[in-house]
UniProtKB/Swiss-Prot annotation:
Function: Core component of nucleosome. Nucleosomes wrap and compact DNA into chromatin, limiting DNA accessibility to the cellular machineries which require DNA as a template. Histones thereby play a central role in transcription regulation, DNA repair, DNA replication and chromosomal stability. DNA accessibility is regulated via a complex set of post-translational modifications of histones, also called histone code, and nucleosome remodeling.
Residues bearing the modification Phosphoserine: S13
Protein name as catalogued: Histone H2B 1/2
Family annotation (PROSITE patterns): HISTONE_H2B
Organism: Danio rerio
Basic residues bias (residue ranges): 8-17
One term under GO cellular component: nucleosome
Record's signal peptide: none
InterPro entries recorded: Histone-fold, Histone_H2A/H2B/H3, Histone_H2B, HISTONE_H2B_site
Residues modified by glycosylation: S111
Cellular compartments annotated: Nucleus; Chromosome
Main location: nucleus
PANTHER family noted in UniProt: HISTONE H2B
Length: 124
């Protein structure tokens, strides 16, 4: 009777693996490579449970998320600077999203962001 297949490790999972050096016997930690892969994978499974993603596509999605993050953070930073504020709040993030994303996409992003902030503050 065939055994059930073990679940494949989540794509993008990061583990600090220790490697033993050749003659010295010293252990060296592998550097951690941070990525949004596990989160992209979770969202993919929520939207399309039967669909997979290639490592190349995952790399593109990771680059996309990093790019959008940097754009929003940069715009929020400028907004805070223009208004002589030293703190980036959810208001700056929301305004940055409205400035960067087009039309309907901005509306959906703002509503999802507001929902996430509300959920976070209510859980405290």
């Amino acid at each position: 009777m065939p055994e059930p297949a073990k679940a494949a490790p989540k794509k993008g999972s990061k583990k600090a693996v220790t490697k033993t050096a050749g003659k010295g016997g010293k252990k060296r930690k592998r550097t951690r490579k941070e990525s949004y892969a596990i989160y992209v994978y979770k969202v993919l499974k929520q939207v399309h449970p039967d669909t997979g993603i290639s490592s190349k596509a995952m790399g593109i999605m990771n680059s996309f998320v990093n790019d959008i993050f940097e754009r929003i953070a940069g715009e929020a930073s400028r907004l805070a600077h223009y208004n002589k504020r030293s703190t980036i709040t959810s208001r700056e993030i929301q305004t940055a999203v409205r400035l960067l994303l087009p039309g309907e996409l901005a509306k959906h992003a703002v509503s999802e962001g507001t929902k996430a902030v509300t959920k976070y503050t209510s859980s405290k």
